[in-house]
Amino acid sequence: TTSCTDAKGKQYRTADGTCNNVNKPTVGSSMDKFKRDVKPQYDDKKGDPRTKGRCLYKTEKGCYRPDLPSARAISVVVHSKQTSVDDDSSKSSAVSPKMPSMGNLQSLGNLLSLGSVPVPAPAPAPEPVSAPSVDIAPAQPVAGPSITDLLGLMSIIQKPKSKPKPKPKPKPQPKPQPESKPILSQGAIGDILGLLGTLVASPEKETPVSSQPDDSISGLMGKVDEPRIRTPKKSPRKKARQSIFRRRDDRKDDRKGLRGTKGRRDDSDDNDDSDDDDDDIEVRISNVFATAAIKFVAALSPDYIDIRGRKIRLRDTYNNPEMVFDELPELIEEMLQQPTEERNRFISKELTDHFLEDGSRSFDEVASIIQRGRDHGVPPYNWFRQFCGLPIVRSFNSRVFGDAGPYLRKVYKSVDDIDIYTGAMSEPNLPGSLLGETFSCIFARQFRDLKFGDSFFYLSDDPLRGFSKEQRRELDTITLSKAMCFVFGLEAVQMNPLRVPSAQNPLSDCEQIPSFFSFLEDPSEGPRSNLLSRVSQSESVASLSGIMPRFFDAESAGPSMKDNGYEGVGNVLPPAFTTNGVSKTVVGASPRGSERFRDVEVEDPEGGFGMPLPGVPIPSMSSNTDAVSQGDPLNELTQMGGTVDGEVEVEEPEIPGPQEGKASGSLPRAFTDGRQMPLGSSPGSLGGVQGSATQPDALDPTILPGVPLDLQPKAQDPTKLPGVPEYLQPKPKSSGLSTQGAVGGEMGKGEIELEDQLGSHGVAGGAVEVGEAEGAAGGIDGSVGSGGMGGSVGVGGSGGMGGSVGVGGMGGSVGVGGSGGMGGSVGVGGMGGSVGVGGSVGSGGSGGSRGAGGSGDDGDDCCQDDSKCSDDEKQKYCKNSDTK
């Protein structure tokens, strides 16, 4: 018995799926039985596959129940393209003008049923378990045709009028579903009827013994740098679809192709097994869904696939995994471009006559589906129409069957004997749907169960298990098209991959498709998305000077972030992130509206640190041509640049001094001692908190507020930029600057001393001593350091902004010594500030060891006076040194 005592209130689901519903611990767990929507029908009412039809009339010996037609006969007569009434192949080969091959949603079926269904476990007998009473036509029910079998079935074998003497039937053994074991679906029929003979039983009689030495668990895992597919029996098309979802878990489903659920929302109202209470909805896959409904995708498979002009028959793709490994991108492109078959009752002969073909042997996938349903005791078609509240079909001439009625009459004795798969596949599609009314009902109920029965569903309102509104908005930005670009390295894809390209669904460059993962993409590995391209599509770039992500909004912030009249809206940004240095800008909004920014165009230059980082605002920009001198490195390596007449220009925002009481911007709660503090002040500079500034609620000063843990900077190396991917870290340059000391260093003729009582990443901190940097190109002498908040410091003596803004340090992030122009300017919790511009960067404790500003001639004194430096320094700085 499974106990869920410890599972209550847990944030994440268990590994095996138990305790999703604490009142029904095993429902929906691994190895759980399928759900029964309708009472099963077995020949012996216990477990023998259904082989007899309904009672047609009474006799002296009882009720006469005719034999059901062979599954193979049904496949050939009803589902084969060769049996069209007027031999009109135009209907059977029609293609959908909208849906590409990707649109068959086979991947959905593989995700839900995983390509396998449980069947009753075989008895421990040396021979295959069989049903001796099964009367089979001259062709096997699931095996593909030999010439004689095919021709015999095409004309439909007439049974003799005299019934053969029935063979003695062994006493049936109950085989309830709870004892079922999942095995590969293609072998299910063979294990029961002994017809396929393709599985080798293991000594434990539970799973087949693999004849392939590579079929170990390690072989099934797949390597990171190769497609994660290890199913050689599957079609490469199916494997490619699986690969997309196994590499990218989060995505938005396009369910328009399965439309038809509209109007089915109240299906459960007419059935006793349903309840409006979510706790009573079982998050399980129904038997009919796994064995029949999801198999509708077989009708969407074409006869061949076209890869770069090569037409490859589907039969030639079986047992050919190399095709996926070698040509996966080409296969994906084909799936996106080639229209799929129109969904109707006709199935390609590649699946009915040549499925898994090996020499002279093949199988019929449609016959397997039909026979599998009988093995599972799935009731006939009419039972499910009644279950869905649809009118029962009483005649083969019913309009419900479209033009399939005459062919159904050829194989079935009664409409009540029609198998659910054949009957539902014969229905015309509902408007705008891939399904008829019966399968639409089954799909709608299944999706309802998965959504409302799952206590961990991502739209759950549970405050612990569900996502916040902001997280949902971010999830909504993830698209299947971008996932395909990211996974397969495609150059272009239509915005909706489940529809063929058209004027309404044009191909889009992968670089232009919005993506939440854009900052994780490596430019060296293919196309990457650009945050600013997304902004340019949705915002007025003419008035955009900066934008903050939703991470820092009020709902996820502490109480101290809701003030200054913005209660419930967001925090007031520090002046460095606003348009004029003093304006109050709400987090999540763009500081725009000032006339002086109307003509600024925002762009992301190629190279350098052009990729935007989460939590780093776009610096203010203006058309002030004096802001950056000609030849400044900022023109090439600006993190977020503005262009005016082709030149990158950045304006230094006004920075208020560390004057207590002048709170033009409030620091986030994580960076204060719990109360509002003036911008630029440090916890160590205010009375009562000297040397003892603690984070409220045990907040880690190195953790950025509102930023997901997987996006937090991992590196603690002071020479590395926090929050910046390794491939974006600045490369060491021979700048001639000294790198002596964990904090501090030399630049030009001046010395910069930075002191923090608790080290380069301290919290409490103390006074900040900033020396004058002679030879520096202007800047703010002594800058703004907020000594103590993580070794924070704006380092003076730099050009332009001069070490710019140490906004309370924000986690040891800022303090770019000797940088030109912006000099790494703005730091937000360690994720920014250090992203220097122009190769400038020393982050936190590095104290401006690699700056691009200042006089740039460190070592002149050394070269002019031998007594001022060592031989190593001479060799490093002096071009004409004898020791070099």
Curated annotation (Swiss-Prot):
Instruction: Give start-end positions of Pro residues composition bias.
Output: 119-129
Domain of life per record: Eukaryota
Q: Where is the composition biased (Basic and acidic residues)?
A: 32-53, 246-267, 865-884
Q: Which GO terms describe its molecular function?
A: heme binding; peroxidase activity
Q: In which tissues is it expressed?
A: Component of the acid-insoluble and acid-soluble organic matrix of calcified layers of the shell (at protein level).
Q: Where is this region: Disordered?
A: 1-53, 78-188, 204-279, 653-695, 710-744, 828-884
Q: Name one Pfam family in it.
A: An_peroxidase
Where composition is biased (Low complexity), the residues are: 91-118
PROSITE patterns per the UniProt record, alphabetical: PEROXIDASE_3
Supply the name of the protein: Peroxidase-like protein 2
Q: Which organism is it from?
A: Lottia gigantea (Giant owl limpet)
